[in-house]
Amino acid sequence: LSLHDALPISALVDAVVPAPDLALRRRALELALAESARLGLTGVHDAGVSLDTLRLMQSLADAGRLPIRVYAMADGDAAALDWLCASGLYTHPGGRLQMRAVKLYMDGALGSRGAALIEDYSDDAGNRGLLVTSQAQVEAAIAKAVRCNVQANTHAIGDRGNRIVLDAYERLLPEDDRAARRFRIEHAQIVAPEDLPRFAQLGVIASMQPIHATSDMPWAGARVGADRLRGAYAWQVLLGSGA
């Protein structure tokens, strides 16, 4: 919902809801970790951790109260990435917490028609989705990650979003060191067929979540049409290519 001037209704709520204090944030983190452990998880990847949240995680690890392993990713080109660049890749002495990656965002989601496509949405002529971060900003953050030896994990869902990220990785990663850097594309849901082999060629990890195939089943065909579905949720093709 939004007002006539396109101000999100949520902005009215955000303006009056107080920010969570340190005690509340710590309690929320403890509950999330405990629930993860209860469900049998031994480790998680937390995609987008601020420097303040990392400090909270460190305090729990220091006290021996981190019940599972946490692979934390810095929240974009912000304070946590700057800290990684200045201090080096981080691993807690206890071995259960590390930060050695940054999470970036290229485009939006498929269901809301925000995933960036090369051609129009099949059910929305004239709309090709959007880049939630400018191409220049994402490329600058990737270049920074390369300089700092930090793994870049970039959200890309549409075929245009994936192509932009693959192009940036190809251009910015040292050719003789690409696979060792273990750069990832998060989700890689809709990929142009000609771009599928590039994951293996560039040593890029396709970090895909099976639940997206089932959650998108009601609308994926309508959004992108039968032809583009050939490059969608392509686990078998990517595995066969060596990705």
Predicted regions, residues:
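Histidine/acidic-residue-rich catalytic or RNA/ligand-binding cores of hydrolases
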Residues: 53-54, 162-170, 197, 216-223
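Alpha-helical structural signal in soluble globular domains
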Residues: 56-64, 144, 168-175, 195-198, ...
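Loop/turn elements at helix/coil->beta-strand transitions in domains of secreted/extracellular proteins
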Residues: 66-69, 95-98, 148-149, 180-181, ...
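Short amphipathic alpha-helices and their capping/turn segments at secondary-structure boundaries
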Residues: 80-102, 191-205
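Structural recognition of alpha->loop->beta junctions
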Residues: 90-98, 172-187, 191, 237-238, ...
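Non-cysteine beta-strand/loop elements that form the S-adenosyl-L-methionine
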Residues: 96-114, 203-214
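Active-site-adjacent C-terminal substructures of enzyme catalytic domains
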Residues: 190-243
